[in-house]
Amino acid sequence: MNPDNYLYLSALLFTIGAAGVLLRRNAIVMFMCVELMLNAANLAFVNFSRMHGQLDGQVVAFFTMVVAACEVVVGLAIIMAIFRTRRSASVDDANLLKH
């Protein structure tokens, strides 16, 4: 398969994720869209790594997945704390936590 197709797929996935972050107000959906954007970047890194014949892109993608796993733990804990206090996962309700 042509490597350009993987780049187009990566750009499409990143665009869908960015649109989801900008258009949705639910924290869980926004969180999943951020993860989609990270996976799109990983796909691009691995594709560039394969095109150039080096392992640098794959190493970056691996460390990005490690950071994303840590982000999942912290992000879901924050979302659950917001849900427990406000009984809603809306981002607008998270603004009220500072009072």
Curated annotation (Swiss-Prot):
It holds the Pfam family Oxidored_q2. Its main location: membrane. Keywords: Cell membrane, Membrane, NAD, Quinone, Translocase, Transmembrane, Transmembrane helix, Transport. It is a multi-pass membrane protein. NDH-1 shuttles electrons from NADH, via FMN and iron-sulfur (Fe-S) centers, to quinones in the respiratory chain. The immediate electron acceptor for the enzyme in this species is believed to be a menaquinone. Couples the redox reaction to proton translocation (for every two electrons transferred, four hydrogen ions are translocated across the cytoplasmic membrane), and thus conserves the redox energy in a proton gradient. NDH-1 is composed of 14 different subunits. Subunits NuoA, H, J, K, L, M, N constitute the membrane sector of the complex. This is NADH-quinone oxidoreductase subunit K. It comes from Mycolicibacterium smegmatis (strain ATCC 700084 / mc(2)155).
